[in-house]
Amino acid sequence: MASYPCHQHASAFDQAARSRGHSNRRTALRPRRQQEATEVRLEQKMPTLLRVYIDGPHGMGKTTTTQLLVALGSRDDIVYVPEPMTYWQVLGASETIANIYTTQHRLDQGEISAGDAAVVMTSAQITMGMPYAVTDAVLAPHIGGEAGSSHAPPPALTLIFDRHPIAALLCYPAARYLMGSMTPQAVLAFVALIPPTLPGTNIVLGALPEDRHIDRLAKRQRPGERLDLAMLAAIRRVYGLLANTVRYLQGGGSWREDWGQLSGTAVPPQGAEPQSNAGPRPHIGDTLFTLFRAPELLAPNGDLYNVFAWALDVLAKRLRPMHVFILDYDQSPAGCRDALLQLTSGMVQTHVTTPGSIPTICDLARMFAREMGEAN
Protein backbone atom coordinates (compact mmCIF):
# COMPACT_ATOMS: atom_id res chain seq x y z
CA MET A 1 0.00 0.00 0.00
CA ALA A 2 1.34 3.43 -0.98
CA SER A 3 2.59 5.75 1.70
CA TYR A 4 1.64 9.40 1.33
CA PRO A 5 4.04 11.94 2.83
CA CYS A 6 1.27 14.45 3.41
CA HIS A 7 -0.55 11.86 5.51
CA GLN A 8 2.62 11.15 7.45
CA HIS A 9 3.09 14.86 8.14
CA ALA A 10 -0.55 15.21 9.14
CA SER A 11 -0.23 12.26 11.47
CA ALA A 12 2.87 13.69 13.07
CA PHE A 13 1.21 17.09 13.38
CA ASP A 14 -1.88 15.56 14.96
CA GLN A 15 0.27 13.60 17.39
CA ALA A 16 2.15 16.72 18.39
CA ALA A 17 -1.09 18.66 18.74
CA ARG A 18 -2.59 15.93 20.89
CA SER A 19 0.53 15.90 23.02
CA ARG A 20 0.38 19.67 23.49
CA GLY A 21 -3.34 19.41 24.14
CA HIS A 22 -2.81 16.81 26.87
CA SER A 23 -0.07 18.96 28.34
CA ASN A 24 -2.26 22.06 28.27
CA ARG A 25 -5.14 20.17 29.85
CA ARG A 26 -2.86 18.83 32.57
CA THR A 27 -1.57 22.35 33.18
CA ALA A 28 -5.11 23.72 33.28
CA LEU A 29 -6.26 20.96 35.61
CA ARG A 30 -3.46 21.55 38.11
CA PRO A 31 -4.82 24.81 39.59
CA ARG A 32 -8.32 23.37 39.76
CA ARG A 33 -7.12 20.24 41.55
CA GLN A 34 -5.01 22.34 43.88
CA GLN A 35 -8.03 24.51 44.62
CA GLU A 36 -10.19 21.44 45.26
CA ALA A 37 -7.54 19.99 47.57
CA THR A 38 -7.36 23.29 49.44
CA GLU A 39 -11.14 23.38 49.78
CA VAL A 40 -11.14 19.83 51.16
CA ARG A 41 -8.46 20.73 53.72
CA LEU A 42 -10.38 23.83 54.76
CA GLU A 43 -13.63 21.86 55.03
CA GLN A 44 -11.95 19.26 57.22
CA LYS A 45 -11.12 22.03 59.68
CA MET A 46 -14.77 23.04 59.92
CA PRO A 47 -16.96 21.92 62.84
CA THR A 48 -18.97 18.75 62.41
CA LEU A 49 -22.71 18.21 62.40
CA LEU A 50 -24.69 15.05 63.14
CA ARG A 51 -28.12 14.78 61.50
CA VAL A 52 -30.44 12.03 62.70
CA TYR A 53 -33.83 11.41 61.08
CA ILE A 54 -36.20 9.42 63.30
CA ASP A 55 -38.59 7.77 60.88
CA GLY A 56 -40.86 4.78 60.47
CA PRO A 57 -44.57 4.00 60.90
CA HIS A 58 -46.62 6.29 63.10
CA GLY A 59 -47.42 5.22 66.65
CA MET A 60 -44.22 3.36 67.56
CA GLY A 61 -42.99 5.90 70.09
CA LYS A 62 -40.63 7.95 67.92
CA THR A 63 -41.53 11.36 69.32
CA THR A 64 -41.36 10.25 72.96
CA THR A 65 -37.99 8.58 72.41
CA THR A 66 -36.60 11.60 70.60
CA GLN A 67 -37.72 14.07 73.25
CA LEU A 68 -36.10 11.95 75.96
CA LEU A 69 -32.85 11.88 73.99
CA VAL A 70 -32.88 15.63 73.38
CA ALA A 71 -33.39 16.21 77.11
CA LEU A 72 -30.00 14.59 77.78
CA GLY A 73 -28.10 17.35 76.00
CA SER A 74 -27.72 21.07 76.49
CA ARG A 75 -29.76 23.56 74.50
CA ASP A 76 -26.70 24.51 72.46
CA ASP A 77 -25.44 21.14 71.26
CA ILE A 78 -28.63 19.24 70.39
CA VAL A 79 -31.70 20.65 68.63
CA TYR A 80 -34.96 18.86 67.91
CA VAL A 81 -36.81 19.55 64.65
CA PRO A 82 -40.40 18.39 65.31
CA GLU A 83 -43.06 17.31 62.86
CA PRO A 84 -44.66 20.39 61.24
CA MET A 85 -48.10 19.96 62.77
CA THR A 86 -49.03 23.65 62.53
CA TYR A 87 -48.29 23.65 58.82
CA TRP A 88 -50.39 20.53 58.27
CA GLN A 89 -53.32 21.78 60.29
CA VAL A 90 -53.28 25.55 59.75
CA LEU A 91 -50.64 27.16 57.55
CA GLY A 92 -50.59 24.83 54.56
CA ALA A 93 -54.20 23.67 54.68
CA SER A 94 -56.98 23.12 57.17
CA GLU A 95 -57.01 19.84 59.12
CA THR A 96 -54.92 17.89 56.61
CA ILE A 97 -54.60 14.77 58.76
CA ALA A 98 -58.33 14.54 59.43
CA ASN A 99 -58.93 15.04 55.71
CA ILE A 100 -56.64 12.11 54.87
CA TYR A 101 -58.28 9.70 57.32
CA THR A 102 -61.80 10.80 56.42
CA THR A 103 -61.10 10.34 52.72
CA GLN A 104 -59.75 6.83 53.25
CA HIS A 105 -62.74 5.95 55.43
CA ARG A 106 -65.19 7.21 52.80
CA LEU A 107 -63.40 5.20 50.11
CA ASP A 108 -63.49 2.07 52.26
CA GLN A 109 -67.22 2.60 52.83
CA GLY A 110 -67.89 3.02 49.11
CA GLU A 111 -69.02 6.63 49.50
CA ILE A 112 -66.48 7.96 46.97
CA SER A 113 -64.57 6.47 44.05
CA ALA A 114 -60.89 5.58 44.04
CA GLY A 115 -60.34 8.41 41.56
CA ASP A 116 -61.96 10.97 43.84
CA ALA A 117 -59.98 9.67 46.80
CA ALA A 118 -56.73 9.86 44.83
CA VAL A 119 -57.29 13.54 44.03
CA VAL A 120 -57.74 14.39 47.71
CA MET A 121 -54.87 12.18 48.88
CA THR A 122 -52.42 13.55 46.34
CA SER A 123 -53.21 17.12 47.30
CA ALA A 124 -52.93 16.28 51.00
CA GLN A 125 -49.56 14.57 50.57
CA ILE A 126 -48.22 17.67 48.82
CA THR A 127 -49.15 19.60 51.96
CA MET A 128 -47.56 16.95 54.18
CA GLY A 129 -44.29 16.95 52.23
CA MET A 130 -43.69 20.64 51.61
CA PRO A 131 -42.13 21.59 55.00
CA TYR A 132 -39.71 18.65 54.88
CA ALA A 133 -38.57 19.34 51.32
CA VAL A 134 -38.07 23.08 51.78
CA THR A 135 -36.21 22.62 55.08
CA ASP A 136 -33.88 20.14 53.40
CA ALA A 137 -33.20 22.71 50.66
CA VAL A 138 -32.46 25.47 53.19
CA LEU A 139 -29.99 23.26 55.08
CA ALA A 140 -28.25 21.85 52.00
CA PRO A 141 -25.76 24.72 51.43
CA HIS A 142 -24.38 24.19 54.93
CA ILE A 143 -23.77 20.44 54.59
CA GLY A 144 -20.25 19.46 53.57
CA GLY A 145 -18.57 16.11 53.13
CA GLU A 146 -18.85 13.14 55.46
CA ALA A 147 -16.47 13.10 58.40
CA GLY A 148 -16.82 9.41 59.15
CA SER A 149 -18.01 7.76 62.34
CA SER A 150 -15.16 5.74 63.87
CA HIS A 151 -13.16 7.65 66.50
CA ALA A 152 -14.82 10.91 65.47
CA PRO A 153 -14.95 13.62 68.14
CA PRO A 154 -18.39 14.70 69.35
CA PRO A 155 -20.18 16.90 66.81
CA ALA A 156 -20.52 20.62 67.42
CA LEU A 157 -24.26 20.20 66.88
CA THR A 158 -26.70 17.31 66.68
CA LEU A 159 -29.96 17.81 64.80
CA ILE A 160 -32.71 15.32 65.55
CA PHE A 161 -35.47 15.41 62.93
CA ASP A 162 -38.94 13.97 63.35
CA ARG A 163 -38.91 12.26 59.93
CA HIS A 164 -36.99 12.61 56.68
CA PRO A 165 -38.59 13.98 53.46
CA ILE A 166 -39.00 10.41 52.17
CA ALA A 167 -41.75 9.84 54.74
CA ALA A 168 -44.10 12.25 52.95
CA LEU A 169 -42.64 11.89 49.45
CA LEU A 170 -42.31 8.11 49.29
CA CYS A 171 -43.43 5.97 52.20
CA TYR A 172 -46.89 7.35 52.97
CA PRO A 173 -47.82 7.80 49.29
CA ALA A 174 -46.75 4.18 48.68
CA ALA A 175 -48.86 3.01 51.63
CA ARG A 176 -51.87 4.95 50.31
CA TYR A 177 -51.31 3.25 46.95
CA LEU A 178 -51.53 -0.11 48.72
CA MET A 179 -54.74 1.14 50.32
CA GLY A 180 -56.23 2.00 46.93
CA SER A 181 -56.41 5.75 47.52
CA MET A 182 -53.47 6.88 45.39
CA THR A 183 -52.32 5.94 41.90
CA PRO A 184 -48.86 4.52 41.18
CA GLN A 185 -48.32 7.43 38.80
CA ALA A 186 -48.84 9.86 41.68
CA VAL A 187 -46.44 7.91 43.89
CA LEU A 188 -43.73 8.17 41.24
CA ALA A 189 -44.48 11.87 40.82
CA PHE A 190 -43.64 12.29 44.51
CA VAL A 191 -40.53 10.14 44.06
CA ALA A 192 -39.34 12.52 41.35
CA LEU A 193 -39.58 15.36 43.89
CA ILE A 194 -37.45 13.69 46.59
CA PRO A 195 -34.50 16.05 47.17
CA PRO A 196 -30.97 14.77 46.52
CA THR A 197 -29.67 12.85 49.52
CA LEU A 198 -27.25 14.99 51.49
CA PRO A 199 -24.04 13.49 52.89
CA GLY A 200 -24.43 12.15 56.41
CA THR A 201 -28.11 11.26 56.13
CA ASN A 202 -28.68 8.92 59.09
CA ILE A 203 -32.19 7.43 59.13
CA VAL A 204 -33.49 5.46 62.11
CA LEU A 205 -36.30 3.03 61.33
CA GLY A 206 -38.17 1.10 63.98
CA ALA A 207 -38.99 -2.48 64.85
CA LEU A 208 -41.97 -3.33 67.05
CA PRO A 209 -44.25 -6.40 67.10
CA GLU A 210 -47.53 -5.62 65.38
CA ASP A 211 -49.72 -6.31 68.41
CA ARG A 212 -47.63 -3.97 70.56
CA HIS A 213 -47.73 -1.39 67.80
CA ILE A 214 -51.53 -1.52 67.62
CA ASP A 215 -51.75 -1.11 71.38
CA ARG A 216 -49.53 1.97 71.39
CA LEU A 217 -51.31 3.55 68.46
CA ALA A 218 -54.70 3.04 70.11
CA LYS A 219 -53.53 4.90 73.22
CA ARG A 220 -52.11 8.01 71.60
CA GLN A 221 -54.08 11.14 70.78
CA ARG A 222 -53.24 12.94 67.54
CA PRO A 223 -55.47 15.60 65.92
CA GLY A 224 -57.64 14.10 63.19
CA GLU A 225 -56.16 10.60 63.42
CA ARG A 226 -58.23 7.39 63.29
CA LEU A 227 -57.17 3.90 64.30
CA ASP A 228 -56.91 2.37 60.82
CA LEU A 229 -55.41 -1.11 61.13
CA ALA A 230 -55.27 -1.66 57.38
CA MET A 231 -53.25 1.52 56.95
CA LEU A 232 -51.00 0.52 59.82
CA ALA A 233 -50.28 -2.80 58.11
CA ALA A 234 -49.61 -1.00 54.82
CA ILE A 235 -47.17 1.52 56.26
CA ARG A 236 -45.34 -1.17 58.23
CA ARG A 237 -45.02 -3.10 54.98
CA VAL A 238 -43.66 -0.09 53.12
CA TYR A 239 -41.02 0.71 55.72
CA GLY A 240 -39.90 -2.92 55.71
CA LEU A 241 -39.54 -2.69 51.93
CA LEU A 242 -37.65 0.59 52.31
CA ALA A 243 -35.03 -0.99 54.57
CA ASN A 244 -34.70 -3.89 52.13
CA THR A 245 -34.37 -1.50 49.19
CA VAL A 246 -31.45 0.36 50.75
CA ARG A 247 -29.72 -2.95 51.51
CA TYR A 248 -30.43 -4.17 47.98
CA LEU A 249 -28.94 -1.04 46.41
CA GLN A 250 -25.94 -0.85 48.70
CA GLY A 251 -25.28 -4.52 48.02
CA GLY A 252 -24.92 -3.79 44.32
CA GLY A 253 -28.49 -4.47 43.22
CA SER A 254 -29.70 -2.88 39.98
CA TRP A 255 -33.43 -2.67 39.44
CA ARG A 256 -32.95 -2.47 35.66
CA GLU A 257 -30.91 -5.67 35.58
CA ASP A 258 -33.25 -7.53 37.94
CA TRP A 259 -36.59 -6.24 36.65
CA GLY A 260 -37.22 -9.45 34.75
CA GLN A 261 -37.17 -11.38 38.02
CA LEU A 262 -40.49 -9.77 38.94
CA SER A 263 -43.27 -11.93 37.59
CA GLY A 264 -46.76 -10.72 36.71
CA THR A 265 -47.92 -7.40 38.11
CA ALA A 266 -47.28 -5.91 41.51
CA VAL A 267 -48.45 -8.12 44.37
CA PRO A 268 -47.49 -6.45 47.64
CA PRO A 269 -45.45 -8.90 49.69
CA GLN A 270 -46.31 -9.57 53.29
CA GLY A 271 -44.74 -7.19 55.74
CA ALA A 272 -41.76 -7.94 57.95
CA GLU A 273 -39.80 -6.00 60.52
CA PRO A 274 -37.03 -3.85 58.98
CA GLN A 275 -33.67 -5.58 59.05
CA SER A 276 -30.22 -4.13 59.62
CA ASN A 277 -27.56 -4.18 56.92
CA ALA A 278 -26.42 -7.63 57.99
CA GLY A 279 -27.29 -10.65 55.88
CA PRO A 280 -27.53 -11.35 52.17
CA ARG A 281 -28.77 -8.85 49.61
CA PRO A 282 -32.58 -8.93 49.41
CA HIS A 283 -34.32 -10.12 46.26
CA ILE A 284 -35.81 -7.34 44.14
CA GLY A 285 -39.23 -8.82 44.91
CA ASP A 286 -38.69 -7.83 48.55
CA THR A 287 -37.98 -4.18 47.72
CA LEU A 288 -40.04 -1.13 46.85
CA PHE A 289 -39.40 -1.74 43.16
CA THR A 290 -41.89 -4.59 43.17
CA LEU A 291 -44.73 -2.12 43.85
CA PHE A 292 -44.22 -0.46 40.49
CA ARG A 293 -44.75 -3.43 38.24
CA ALA A 294 -48.28 -2.13 37.83
CA PRO A 295 -50.38 -2.23 34.64
CA GLU A 296 -50.81 1.55 34.66
CA LEU A 297 -47.04 2.00 34.30
CA LEU A 298 -46.38 -0.59 31.58
CA ALA A 299 -46.19 -0.04 27.83
CA PRO A 300 -47.95 -2.51 25.48
CA ASN A 301 -44.74 -4.56 25.22
CA GLY A 302 -44.73 -5.06 29.00
CA ASP A 303 -41.83 -2.73 29.74
CA LEU A 304 -42.09 0.34 31.91
CA TYR A 305 -42.68 3.57 30.06
CA ASN A 306 -39.41 5.50 30.06
CA VAL A 307 -40.73 8.33 32.21
CA PHE A 308 -41.59 5.87 35.00
CA ALA A 309 -38.28 4.03 34.60
CA TRP A 310 -36.48 7.32 35.04
CA ALA A 311 -38.44 7.90 38.24
CA LEU A 312 -37.20 4.54 39.54
CA ASP A 313 -33.66 5.61 38.65
CA VAL A 314 -34.24 8.68 40.83
CA LEU A 315 -35.52 6.45 43.63
CA ALA A 316 -32.39 4.30 43.47
CA LYS A 317 -30.13 7.34 43.42
CA ARG A 318 -31.84 8.89 46.44
CA LEU A 319 -31.90 5.75 48.61
CA ARG A 320 -28.47 4.28 47.90
CA PRO A 321 -26.40 6.81 49.95
CA MET A 322 -28.58 6.66 53.07
CA HIS A 323 -27.24 5.30 56.35
CA VAL A 324 -30.07 3.22 57.81
CA PHE A 325 -30.26 2.09 61.44
CA ILE A 326 -32.92 -0.03 63.15
CA LEU A 327 -34.17 0.83 66.65
CA ASP A 328 -35.99 -1.78 68.72
CA TYR A 329 -39.01 -0.01 70.21
CA ASP A 330 -40.17 -3.07 72.15
CA GLN A 331 -38.82 -1.71 75.44
CA SER A 332 -39.47 1.11 77.90
CA PRO A 333 -39.19 4.75 76.77
CA ALA A 334 -35.92 5.07 78.68
CA GLY A 335 -34.67 1.85 77.09
CA CYS A 336 -35.55 3.21 73.64
CA ARG A 337 -33.73 6.43 74.44
CA ASP A 338 -30.60 4.60 75.56
CA ALA A 339 -30.69 2.33 72.51
CA LEU A 340 -31.00 5.36 70.23
CA LEU A 341 -28.11 7.05 72.00
CA GLN A 342 -26.02 3.94 71.41
CA LEU A 343 -26.91 3.96 67.71
CA THR A 344 -25.71 7.54 67.32
CA SER A 345 -22.15 6.48 68.14
CA GLY A 346 -22.01 4.64 64.81
CA MET A 347 -23.63 7.38 62.74
CA VAL A 348 -21.93 9.51 60.12
CA GLN A 349 -21.18 13.16 60.79
CA THR A 350 -20.55 15.83 58.18
CA HIS A 351 -18.40 18.92 58.15
CA VAL A 352 -20.27 22.17 57.71
CA THR A 353 -19.31 24.47 54.87
CA THR A 354 -18.70 27.82 56.59
CA PRO A 355 -17.60 29.05 60.02
CA GLY A 356 -21.09 30.49 60.53
CA SER A 357 -22.98 27.36 59.51
CA ILE A 358 -23.53 25.93 62.99
CA PRO A 359 -25.29 29.01 64.46
CA THR A 360 -27.21 29.46 61.20
CA ILE A 361 -28.43 25.86 61.30
CA CYS A 362 -29.44 26.28 64.96
CA ASP A 363 -31.44 29.39 64.10
CA LEU A 364 -33.14 27.67 61.15
CA ALA A 365 -34.10 24.64 63.22
CA ARG A 366 -35.51 26.75 66.04
CA MET A 367 -37.45 28.95 63.63
CA PHE A 368 -38.98 25.80 62.14
CA ALA A 369 -39.92 24.51 65.60
CA ARG A 370 -41.47 27.81 66.71
CA GLU A 371 -43.45 28.35 63.53
CA MET A 372 -44.59 24.83 62.68
CA GLY A 373 -43.90 22.53 65.60
CA GLU A 374 -47.28 22.54 67.31
CA ALA A 375 -50.80 23.11 66.04
CA ASN A 376 -52.32 26.35 67.25
Swiss-Prot record:
Catalytic residue list: 83
Family membership noted in the UniProt record: Belongs to the herpesviridae thymidine kinase family.
Effect of residue 175 to T: In mutant KG111
Top-level taxon in the UniProt lineage: Viruses
Basic residues bias locations: 19-32
Full protein name: Thymidine kinase
Function of the protein: Catalyzes the transfer of the gamma-phospho group of ATP to thymidine to generate dTMP in the salvage pathway of pyrimidine synthesis. The dTMP serves as a substrate for DNA polymerase during viral DNA replication. Allows the virus to be reactivated and to grow in non-proliferative cells lacking a high concentration of phosphorylated nucleic acid precursors.
Phylogenetic classification of the source organism: Viruses, Duplodnaviria, Heunggongvirae, Peploviricota, Herviviricetes
Further details from the record: Phosphorylates and thereby activates certain drugs like acyclovir (ACV), valacyclovir, and famciclovir to a toxic form, that leads to successful suppression of the infection, while the uninfected cell does not have this ability because it lacks TK. Mutations in thymidine kinase may induce HSV resistance to antiviral therapies in immunocompromised patients. The most frequently observed resistant strains are unable to express TK and are avirulent in animal models of disease.
Residues binding ATP: 56-63, 216
InterPro entries: Herpes_TK, P-loop_NTPase
Pfam families: Herpes_TK
